[in-house]
UniProtKB/Swiss-Prot annotation:
Alphabetized InterPro entries for the sequence: Ribosome_maturation_RimP (IPR003728), RimP_C (IPR028998), RimP_C_sf (IPR036847), RimP_N (IPR028989), RimP_N_sf (IPR035956)
SUPFAM superfamilies in UniProt: YhbC-like, C-terminal domain, YhbC-like, N-terminal domain
GO CC aspect terms: cytosol
PANTHER family per record: RIBOSOME MATURATION FACTOR RIMP
Protein name per Swiss-Prot or TrEMBL: Ribosome maturation factor RimP
Keyword terms: Cytoplasm, Ribosome biogenesis
Pfam family for this entry, one: DUF150_C
Family statement drawn from the similarity comment of this UniProt entry: Belongs to the RimP family.
Species lineage: Bacteria, Bacillati, Bacillota, Bacilli, Lactobacillales
Role description: Required for maturation of 30S ribosomal subunits.
Localization: Cytoplasm
UniProt feature coiled coil, ranges: none
Length: 158
């Protein structure tokens, strides 16, 4: 499994941007005995359609096949899809879009006895985020240092 996906990212991002789309995430995983290169793309403002995904899948596949040296010499399955409603929050622009939205945050270490929080993102800066969480019937503001955040994504509020 490649440790560095940067050459792949640098090769395919211009193809994706050239179709007015955004590269949301890229991952290379092994499931059972099969390797997968998963590429998540989106298009603003209304999301990406299946025709665009199919076209990008073809173009990205061709781009990857033409790379020398081959960054993925072992056989793999290419999956290109929308990130869905619970898209990851990774880049700074993702965090900005998440302001006021309901999000899921996973931490490296427990904070106030928990490693996972869901709530509305009230504010953020370079150092921390402010999340409004609900504990039973009361609301509480929680400040989380950004360096403690292992993962974040949009969430669906029930």
């Amino acid at each position: 499994m490649p440790k560095n996906l940067t050459p792949i990212l640098e090769a395919i991002e211009p193809v994706i941007i050239g179709h007015d789309c955004e590269l949301v995430d890229l991952e290379y995983v092994k499931e059972k005995s099969q390797d997968y290169l998963r590429i998540y793309v989106d298009k603003q403002p209304n999301g990406i359609d299946i025709e665009t995904i199919a076209e990008l899948s073809e173009l990205v596949g061709e781009k990857l096949d033409s790379m020398q040296p081959d960054p993925l010499p072992d056989p793999y399955i290419l999956e290109l899809s929308s990130p869905g409603l619970e898209r990851p929050i990774k880049k700074e622009q993702d965090w900005e879009k998440a302001k006021g939205q309901y999000i899921h945050v996973g931490l490296y270490q427990k904070l106030e006895g928990e490693k996972v929080f869901e709530g509305h993102l009230l504010d953020l800066d370079d150092q921390e985020i402010k999340l409004e969480i609900k504990i039973k019937t009361r609301r509480k503001q929680l400040t989380i240092p950004r360096k403690q955040i292992a993962s974040a994504r949009f969430a669906i509020e029930f």
